[in-house]
């Protein structure tokens, strides 16, 4: 990602459209606390990058809005995780000890899919569906998605693809691979994809993640062993390493947005 030639970030920044090749453009930003003097940034910890913002003169208020929206979504996610905690048979504060503003690796992505007369070539799935983004699992704890009301998402259930209803008055909540991992697949991370729709639309996913050094020991919720096909706990893994491996696999499979 980049805003200009000086941006050396791996993730944060602007991913531009490329005429004749790529129509989608996006802007990614992460924890606003990740400044150059943040201890994890200072020592070069992977996935810790200061955000690169467009000029305030050219885009007045953009940065302040984005940072405010990030923390609003963080607070919403904190409340959602209380519900997940209770559903897992834990105290509602279970995730509070892992999900902190100071070190969260959560990221926000602003994605624009444009309406074009001459759209660049798009990928086609084996079933003939034209794709805006191929099938994948979200590399996150959970994902909180806002999108404009243009139907495009599909979820895979029993080898069949189903359209996901869309609305600009609701958030769509999805379980990511880390939630699946720490609950031994009790909360399944669904495979999903984005259909190609030649229409102007926006997609704003907030990928919820805990800190890099965080380790949540996997567990099977009490009383669920009968319906859960996985009986052995996954081995503990440092969250940052889990994310790095997941992101690398996602880029290899589908490329960058």
Where are the model-predicted features located?
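Peripheral, non-catalytic segments flanking oxidoreductase cores
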Residues: 1-257
